[in-house]
Amino acid sequence: MQQEEIIEGYYGASKGLKKSGIYAKLDFLQSATGLILALFMIAHMFLVSSILISDEAMYKVAKFFEGSLFLKAGEPAIVSVVAAGVILILVAHAFLALRKFPINYRQYKVFKTHKHLMKHGDTSLWFIQALTGFAMFFLASIHLFVMLTEPESIGPHGSSYRFVTQNFWLLYIFLLFAVELHGSIGLYRLAIKWGWFKNVSIQGLRKIKWAMSVFFIVLGLCTYGAYIKKGLENKDNGIKTMQEAIEADGKFHKE
């Protein structure tokens, strides 16, 4: 390894003590991937909550993202492509974020002491974001893998079958809180870091952050309840397999 690389690796500076720009670039990439995922989270929540309007509305939304405007019956593979893209962005964001995680017990103790002494709200928020991000990486990966491999199962009957009969309700309740807290805290910290709303005070941004958290968690819980209710109805109506659930969704299709 070159001497310059060793110096830069230890101190983040070149041999001439010129600050390396790689860390700023990595920081920008972390912010960019986080913003994309946060915006996707917001859009995704509004889309899945369409079941609160009606089963048919949720079916139409699902088909819209299968390209039903251009392909009469829609193409589930389009959803798989989107899921694959989100997985790649999620993995990239996770690896970029890991740079700032305590990597051993000593670093964790330093952070914990700092957090205790400072008693600063944003430091506590970062800790919550780190915990939810760690949980979300595993929980969201499972959900995205299902969307990648079974895109045709997305629909009012298929999704609710997965919720109840396949017991995904347990995963989704933890994923709901992890995603909504992580996303809202992330957007708040991005707004401060990049100075997006200079006319809004930090106190104002915090209020917006908590309003977002409450709104999306309440919307998510209502949506969660709707899928549970629909999944129980599936059982009462004799739907015993995912294929039967998919066929039940197909009844909403209009030639």
UniProtKB/Swiss-Prot annotation:
It holds the Pfam family Sdh_cyt. It comes from the Bacteria. The chain crosses the membrane at residues 33-53, 78-98, 126-146, 168-188, 208-228. It is found in: Cell inner membrane. Its cofactor is heme b. GO terms for biological process: tricarboxylic acid cycle. It is a multi-pass membrane protein. Keywords: Cell inner membrane, Cell membrane, Electron transport, Heme, Iron, Membrane, Metal-binding, Transmembrane, Transmembrane helix, Transport, Tricarboxylic acid cycle. GO terms for cellular component: plasma membrane. Heme b bD binds at residues 44, 143. GO terms for molecular function: metal ion binding. Binds 2 heme b molecules per subunit, called the proximal (bP) and distal (bD) hemes. Heme b bP binds at residues 93, 182. InterPro entries: Fum_red_B_TM, SQR/QFR_C/D, SuccDH_FuR_B_TM-su. Part of an enzyme complex containing three subunits: a flavoprotein (frdA), an iron-sulfur protein (frdB), and diheme cytochrome b (frdC). The fumarate reductase enzyme complex is required for fumarate respiration. This subunit anchors the complex in the membrane and binds a diheme cytochrome b. Belongs to the diheme cytochrome b FrdC family. This is Fumarate reductase cytochrome b subunit. It comes from Helicobacter pylori (strain J99 / ATCC 700824).
